[in-house]
Amino acid sequence: MSAHVQVTREIAAPADILWQMVADVPRMGEWSPENESAQWLGGATEARPGATFRGTNRNGSKRWSSVGTIVEADPGRSLAFRVKAAGMNVAEWSYRFEPTAQGCVVTESWTDRRNPVLKVLSRRVTGVADRATHNREGMAQTLERLAAAAEQQATPSA
């Protein structure tokens, strides 16, 4: 059975702003405590189904990269991508945006798609023994940082 983690946070910013921020994949390192950088691949310049990107991640002295493929991109509503490393399935990530009177509820989800061999190898490569707990903590930090940036952007200056 694959692990699934979901973290939800209400953010005082419109869904369209939040979606644009998350869909700007090269900016993910601004919010995520693990992602260092991301670059679009194959001429892609925006999040649309089929677009691919390379993400570089870090945990302490450990560094690794993987390739993500956008599988869902519905502006203002949802974004999802599947991640592979060395051609093997790693995970599926998704973001859901639900407008509220105060802004938007954002739900970030992660589903582990690694096979047993890749789970063992990834512990060595990433230094993370409990990926679900590690991701839950990182996702909470990601949404906190996303909220701070989005709320600042959504608040008109005096």
Q: Each predicted region: which residue ranges?
A:
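Hydrophobic pocket/interface hotspot
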Residues: 18-22, 28, 53, 70, ...
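Generic structural detector for well-ordered beta-strands
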Residues: 8-12, 39, 69, 82, ...
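Short beta-edge strand/loop motif at the mouth of beta-sheet-based domains
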Residues: 6, 26-69, 73-78
